[in-house]
């Protein structure tokens, strides 16, 4: 499987924990009306909370205390496989890096002596260029396009080994860009300070992110339906969780809607969480077992 070589990685003096933005070429969705903002999916119930709370996790310990774990559970009235890599950011230096050309995730991870990897934000499938705001070493490498503005309401910064998730729009991008040398925009924002963010922020975000120039035709048809998903979260004790939910496997894992994903992030105990590029891009990797999940485009 090939990916675009724009990526992020985390590393310590001895070992690198790699967070990459390799992009798998996927289908482009057609448009739906902007007014259709209620995420489709199965209503969350107490049974869903219990299923997540009592999930049987298969775990594998990585270097410097990082843990890779996965589970197959029945939640939201559907089968789901959830894979997680959790680590302490105090034991790793975090960086955002943009690579020059296409390569396989595993190859790039090995080249950087990575401990683990996950895909990042959105990109242009024709050119490989980022389509969300990205600033590296104080230099802006990409701006959020109008087509991505509707879902780009969050960002992750990695300065001074402190991982933070922020709210993001056309106004905050300037402030964040001045404050942080390394920052990447993505979205939708799933959690902020323990509060689920998707429902209240989406209707307003499209106009904010593009200074009122976005249109309903920019929203991909099916965005709110169940798909493979990837996201990154921070727990109250500042542990980092990189998560992938497999999708498009009817009997194995159908994937989640954005609404279901924010519910999952909350149930996993996260304080802040940010959705990343999903679909065929959703990949979680570590240097002990290789690709942990089952990517499907």
Regions of interest found by a model, annotated:
Residues 1-49:
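Bacterial Sec-dependent N-terminal signal peptides
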Residues 44-167:
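Zymogen propeptides
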Residues 83-86, 154-157, 189, 230-234, ...:
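Short beta-strand scaffold segments in enzyme catalytic cores
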Residues 92, 161-164, 196, 240, ...:
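Hydrophobic residues embedded in beta-strands of well-ordered beta-sheets
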Residues 98-103, 168-175, 245-250:
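Short, solvent-exposed aromatic-acidic interface loops
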Residues 127-150, 215-271, 281-297:
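Conserved, well-ordered active-site substructure
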Residues 128-222:
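Active-site-adjacent helix-turn-beta-strand microarchitecture at beta-sheet edges
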